[in-house]
Amino acid sequence: MTKITHEFELYGKSYRLETGELAKQATGAVVVSQGDTILLTTAVVSKERRDLDFFPLTVDFIEKMYAVGRIPGGYLKREARPSEKGTLTARLVDRPIRPSFPDGMRNDVHIVITTLSCDQVNQPDVISIMGASAALMVGGVPIEGPVAGVRIARAKAEDGSIDYIVNPTFEEAEASDLNLTVAGTKEYISMVECGADEVTEEDMIGALEFAQEAIGAFCEEQQKFL
């Protein structure tokens, strides 16, 4: 398979999607990055349809200490079960991806997101959603997509106006009174997760509308990549 790379910039931040070089035996594999935070996302789909009354989708988010230039310390120098953050990130990916599959899908689907590099500036969780969507679509899996996710923070300008920040850095998110994560397609929102400090209803609606617009932009970039 020929290596395909798509680089783009949205809302002041640089992104990269790449396929055709790693994990060639997977159904679909995409390396997604924001800055120097780099993730390998693989999707494997079984050929046989299982006789089940539920959709067997599994999402794993694997954090590697080498991604931040460290090795595990202590007596056991090996990485064991996922951290709480890893489990929550896997669920963050599962929630918007699961509804995108067709009704009656009973093939096993396993999505694995592995951190190759973490610059400790850009957050890896929301770009995992874009990586999972792109990996499925590269592999020809019939999903209703593309699917993308964004995190919205906000900052007050000197004139008192509010500026929304898409996929804020750790520092930008820490300074914001709004931490809104939204995922879906160009047409609809399928997942919302939020923490906020007395944000008005009007501001929340504005943030959701802005998030939907940003999701559409990321979906369009995935289509260019494919």
Residue ranges: model-predicted function:
Residues T19-G20, A29, A43-V45, L52-F54, ...:
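Short acidic, glycine/serine/threonine-rich loops at helix termini
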Residues P82-V93, D125-S128, T200-L208, Q212-F218:
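Generic structural signal for well-ordered, non-membrane alpha-helical segments
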Residues G20, A26-V30, H110, G145-R151, ...:
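Gly/Lys-enriched N-terminal cap/neck module of very large, oligomeric protein machines
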Residues A26-H110, T115-N122, K186, E193, ...:
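Glycine-rich, flexible beta-strand/loop modules in the N-terminal catalytic cores of phosphate-handling
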Residues R16, L40, V93, D103-A157:
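Glycine-rich anion/phosphate-binding loop at the beta-strand->alpha-helix junction
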Residues M1-Q25, A29-V31:
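Short, Gly/Pro- and small/polar-rich lid/capping loops
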Residues G140-L226:
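Mobile "lid/hinge" segments at catalytic clefts and subdomain interfaces of large enzymes
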